[in-house]
Every structure is written in structure tokens, then in C-alpha cells.
Amino acid sequence: MITLTELKCLADAQSSYHILKPWWDVFWYYITLIMLLVAVLAGALQLTQSRVLCCLPCKVEFDNHCAVPWDILKASMNTSSNPGTPLPLPLRIQNDLHRQQYSYIDAVCYEKQLHWFAKFFPYLVLLHTLIFAACSNFWLHYPSTSSRLEHFVAILHKCFDSPWTTRALSETVAEQSVRPLKLSKSKILLSSSGCSADIDSGKQSLPYPQPGLESAGIESPTSSVLDKKEGEQAKAIFEKVKRFRMHVEQKDIIYRVYLKQIIVKVILFVLIITYVPYFLTHITLEIDCSVDVQAFTGYKRYQCVYSLAEIFKVLASFYVILVILYGLTSSYSLWWMLRSSLKQYSFEALREKSNYSDIPDVKNDFAFILHLADQYDPLYSKRFSIFLSEVSENKLKQINLNNEWTVEKLKSKLVKNAQDKIELHLFMLNGLPDNVFELTEMEVLSLELIPEVKLPSAVSQLVNLKELRVYHSSLVVDHPALAFLEENLKILRLKFTEMGKIPRWVFHLKNLKELYLSGCVLPEQLSTMQLEGFQDLKNLRTLYLKSSLSRIPQVVTDLLPSLQKLSLDNEGSKLVVLNNLKKMVNLKSLELISCDLERIPHSIFSLNNLHELDLRENNLKTVEEIISFQHLQNLSCLKLWHNNIAYIPAQIGALSNLEQLSLDHNNIENLPLQLFLCTKLHYLDLSYNHLTFIPEEIQYLSNLQYFAVTNNNIEMLPDGLFQCKKLQCLLLGKNSLMNLSPHVGELSNLTHLELIGNYLETLPPELEGCQSLKRNCLIVEENLLNTLPLPVTERLQTCLDKC
């Protein structure tokens, strides 16, 4: 038995698809119901009424039909020429039949003589109706289509009822009404404000378009803020729409099934119109029934009446009219499907009217479903389109983001960075919370892995902002925000996500002093940039490029001659052309990192103002060119670390002004005595080499403050090392030292001592003389500390927290 609950669920399931049924589907539905009533009525009449009444047996049969005796006599007289021929007379047989005999004759005549169309007419109507109904509803129950349709209907109802839909539509209406007023006000402001006028004129003077620069958005006064629950619900709808679109747009199975349904209906319509009118003529009231039952009843032919003939003719005619209406509608729907491009759906008209100009066009089954929904009510597709717009989604994300990131939560994220600046680091968010602009004390804003960031005019509230870091994020800057950054931003760090894509707004930062660009920036793209862009960076002093280049971009050497520091990390790719370095005469610091250099480039020796040179992580094996550094009178810092240098040439002594020398992570085995002619050295790092001893002449480095020989093979320290009275940091770890000279106590300025990883058995008690050395800055095995006298240990421990 089917319960009422099951019937109710079935009815609800059918009614949920009403938005996908055009007017012809509704028309078919009602015609099908009428056809079904015709079938039921005809069937009921056939079952309840007497089928065939045969109450007049034929007593005289003449010329293969029933006749009265007088007709036979007259015919015989006209045809017979012999008057003596006897007339045939009917047999004298009992003609009063029993009721059961009449019933028998009725049944036999119904089965043998009544035309099949008259007998099966109700069943044919029922069969046709069921086929029509099946064709109309097959796509709603076929698994491959019904699942998609159910998903679409469920999402569509949520889109229709979502508060976000109402908010977006009302916002569109409000913006359209407010836009003319805003435009007139903006003209007045631009004409009265000198700063704004300068910005506007600057924009007009740009000879190229400005991607990434957008006008400030107009805030709708009528827009209401969603609560957290409504925001999460709208966010879930956006995700469902994305997944549904991705799934449905791949195929056109719904379109093909619906089209085949209509084709079957048209074929069935043609078939019915062909045979039903023809067989309708075979339904007659009177039936001449000839059956071979004379032995049982005494008669062979009977005159019968089919009592349902007239009403069946009426019902059949009415049924034909219904089929014609059904067929014409099916033909129209077939023509509509073949004429229209139902696999493409464009929101162009909606994009022109609304402020969501990014609503994408859809295709295949998604487009077809929307076309069907438009036949029911175009408002459904309009509301649905809001959840296809990325602009709409971004606005929702912004609202949810603001609800999540309150001012208190953002303040808890403020930290002091290594440069002692107040920094806010936002990582993997959906956008930039509006409450960020309430943190006026912030000096550094770091944005990492944020897909879409927009800096509005509210950034001008961050009066202390001097540094901006954008790592693997897409940043769009409004014009008012750009005006603020032009005046206040000093340091900009960018890590690119897309190859060679440098935002154009970077070249408007006229007060920028340091620019860090990290990513796959191709030299061709750099050289083809608008020259005016780099020329505007007149205050730029530091440029850092991390990329894979074959040469230093010409735009850097030609348009930034006043650059003081250039750092290039080539990520292991070979840097071939370096001749254009000669143009950068004002360069004070040069870093060529991971450039696969095998020799020191000669173009460096032309940089007379160079103070610092860093060539780390290259493939340098020899540095014979070091003699040429004597022409660089200002060179004070030389870093040749992380290379394959086997020896230090004796010409190193010519660098009398050298103050810092880094040769760690090489293959150096010996130190030339000329090295100790660089008496201004205060920093010397020889860690991770193959040194076995340190010359006694190290005592001439009287200004030495930092000395590192970690991870070598040194067995003994020269006494001259302890003559470097200014030594503050001494790193001797991971060597082969057997003992530590008592002269270590003479290093009164020593603050950091590393001895771990040697073969020491005891520590000299003279360590007590290192008054600046603290326990936490003495890196040694714990058991060696126990060899020190207790007063020395206690003194080291008392100042543990001050190191």
C-alpha cells in the first residue's frame, strides 16, 4: 500500500521542478490529465455498460445478408422464369432463445465481429497518455539528469532566499541612483583640492593604461551588514555554485535527453494522427454478426447493436483534438530548441544593467537549465547570477573577513620585527580586513598568500606606514591610496606569483628608497617597460632582484644611475653579460648571489665608489683578480663565502682599507701572511674550510673584533691571537684543539666564545679574566664547565640573563 506520506513526498518532488517547466510543459501536463480522464471514462463505460446486444436473430438469410421472407419471395419471382418452381420457405425451428443463449451470442459477436479499435480504444488512449507522460518526466527521473536538476533546484532556492541576494540587488539599485550625484561631487572635489588635481593630472599624463589601478568604490548607504551566520551561508552557496558549474558545464546530457523526449512526442503525435482518424470510421452502431453457432441456437446470423459506438466516436474525436494540440505544442518546442542556441547563455544584458560586470557566460547543460528557468521566470536567473560574480563573492568575503578580524584581534597580531618596527603580518586570508586601517601605530604591513588585496583610500589613516611587503599576492591600489603611498612609502618588497608581472603602480612611488623584487622577472619584460616608470623612481637607492637572468637588465643600469645598492640573486642561473655594470658609477654596495660566476667580473673594478661586494654562492675557484681591488679605495667589505676557492692570493695584502672579509664555506687550506697586512680588519670569517693552523702574524690585526674558524682542522691556537685585545666574538668550534691557552683571559672584551666540538679536557681558570663573557655566550660541552673553579662558574651564571 502507498501511504499518504509517500504520496505527499511524491507531489512535493514534482512541484519542486516547476521552475524548470516552460509553459508548454505545463500545457502538456494538463492535456495529459484530460487524456487520462478520457481513457478512464472510456474504460469505465466499457466495463459497466453492455458491450454488444444481439437480440434479433436472422430467420431468413438471402444473398449473404439477413432478409425478411417477403423480400425473398419477391426476388425469386423476378428472377425465376419457371412459374412452377417451388418457393423456398423457412424452416419451422423454434426461434425463442433462452437468455443464456443471447448472452452467449453477445459474447461471441463482441469477440469475433466487433472491430479491434472499438474494443481497445480506452486502452490505446491510456497507453498513449502514459507514453506522453513518460516522455515529459523521463528527464526528471533519469539518474544522470535528475541528480543535476535536483542539485540545481536546491541551489536556486537557496540563492533566491539568501539575504545576500537581496542585499546585492538593493545595492545595485542604490549605486545606480547615487552614481550621478557622486560623479558631480567628485568633480567639485577635484577642482577644489590641489592634491587631487595633481593626481588626476598625473593619471592623464600616463601614456599607457593602468591595470591594477581602480577608482574608489562607491559605498552604498542602503547596504546592510550580514551577520556571521548569514555570511557563512552565502559563502557556502558560492562554493556550491562553483562546484555545480564546474560539473554541469562539462556535458550536455540534459539538453540531449530533453530534445530526444520532444522528438519521441512528435513521432508519437504523427503516428496517432495517422491511424486514429482512419480507424475511427470502423466504430459503428449496427453490427451484422455471422457466427457458426446454428447447431446451438438454430440461427447463423444476428443483428447486433454496439451501444457505446456514438459516445466512443465523440471521445475519440475529442481525443484527436487533444493530440493535435499536444502535437502542435511539441512541434513548437522542438522548433524552439533547434532554432535557439540553448547551449550558450549570456548575461550581457544583466551585466550592462548591474554593477556586477564580471558575471560569466555559461554553456552546455548549465546554459540550457537557465534558458528553461527563464521561460518560467527570468528573475530566477538574475538572482542566480549574483553567485556567479567574483565581485559579489569578494564583497561577501570582505564582510565575513571584517566580522572575523576585529580590531582587538588585529592588535594582538602586531609585533616588533628585527628592524625594531611595528609590523602586522597577515597570512593566507581572503582579503584585507577593513579594521587594519584602524591600527595607526603600524609601520610595516606584510601581506602573504592573499589572492586578491585591494588598498582603498582608508590606507591614508596609517600615518606611520613606511614599509609594505606583498608576497605571492595580487594587490590593487585605488587612486587615493596611491597618492598616499607616493608620499609616505619608503620600502616595498614584492614576491611575484606570475612571471614578469610587476604592477604599474610601483612606478608611481616617487619617494620610494628601497625596492625588493623577487620572482621570475624576464629581462625582455624588464627592458620593455615604460621608461617613464623607472625614471620616476628618483629617490630609489636600493634595488633587489631575485630571478633567473642572463644579464643585468638594461633598464636598471641606464635609468637608475643614482642607485647605491644593487643586489641580484640569480637562483643558480649563469649571469653572462656584466659589462653594463660600468654605468652604475654611484653604486656603493653590489651583491651578485648564485650567478654561477667562475671569475670575478672585471666590470666591478670600474665602480670606484664601491664599499661592499658580496659574491656568495657562486662557482669561484680562484680570485687572482683580487689585486685589481686595490683601485677601489673605498672597498671595506668583501664577501666571497660559499664558493670553491682553494687559496687566497698574496695580493690580498694590497686591500689596506678592508674591514670585513668573509671567506667561509670554501676549500682554503692555508692563510697567506699578506692577509694580516689588512690591519683595518675587524671582521674575519674563515669557517668551514680546511685550515690546519693560524699564523702567529694574526696579532697584527689589532682591530679584529670578530674571528671565526668553525669547522676546520686547527690543532693549536697561536699566542698572537690573544694579542687582539678588541676581540669580542671568537668561534673555534668543531676543530681539533687539545687545549685552550691561558692567554684567553687577556681578552677582556670577549662576549662570545665557542669551543664545542673539540678535544678539550679542561677549561683554563683564566677565563675569569673575560669579564664581558657570560654563561649563555660560552658554547661548550656541559662537562667542561665542571672543570672551572666554582667562583668562575658562579660569575658566569649570575649574568646569564644579560647576554
Swiss-Prot record:
Q: Which residues lie on this side of the membrane: Extracellular?
A: 47-119, 283-307
PROSITE patterns from the xrefs? LRR (PS51450)
What residues bear Phosphoserine in this entry?
Answer: S186, S196
- State the annotated membrane topology for this chain: Multi-pass membrane protein
Domain of life of the native organism: Eukaryota
Q: In which ranges do the LRR repeats occur?
A: 464-486, 488-509, 511-532, 539-559, 562-582, 586-607, 609-630, 634-655, 657-678, 680-701, 703-724, 726-747, 749-771
Disulfide bridges in this chain = C55-C304, C109-C289
Q: Which residues are glycosylated?
A: N78
Which UniProt keywords are listed? Cell membrane, Disulfide bond, Endoplasmic reticulum, Glycoprotein, Ion channel, Ion transport, Leucine-rich repeat, Membrane, Phosphoprotein, Repeat, Transmembrane, Transmembrane helix, Transport
Query: Chief localization class?
Result: membrane
Q: Which chain regions cross the lipid bilayer?
A: 26-46, 120-140, 262-282, 308-328
List the coiled-coil residues.
Answer: none
Please list the reactions this protein catalyses: chloride(in) = chloride(out); iodide(out) = iodide(in); taurine(out) = taurine(in)
Q: Does the keyword Protein biosynthesis apply?
A: no
Compartment annotation:
Cell membrane; Endoplasmic reticulum membrane
List GO BP terms, alphabetically. aspartate transmembrane transport; cyclic-GMP-AMP transmembrane import across plasma membrane; intracellular signal transduction; monoatomic anion transmembrane transport
Check the record and name the SMART domains matching this protein.
LRR_TYP
- Residue ranges in the Cytoplasmic topological domain are 1-25, 141-261, 329-803
GO cellular component assignments: cytoplasm; endoplasmic reticulum membrane; monoatomic ion channel complex; plasma membrane
Q: How does it assemble?
A: Heterohexamer; oligomerizes with other LRRC8 proteins (LRRC8A, LRRC8C, LRRC8D and/or LRRC8E) to form a heterohexamer. In vivo, the subunit composition may depend primarily on expression levels, and heterooligomeric channels containing various proportions of the different LRRC8 proteins may coexist.
Per the similarity annotation, which family is this?
Belongs to the LRRC8 family.
Q: What is known of its domains?
A: The volume-regulated anion channel (VRAC) channel forms a trimer of dimers, with symmetry mismatch between the pore-forming domain and the cytosolic LRR repeats, a topology similar to gap junction proteins.
Task: Output this protein's name.
Answer: Volume-regulated anion channel subunit LRRC8B
Task: Say which species the protein is native to.
Answer: Homo sapiens (Human)
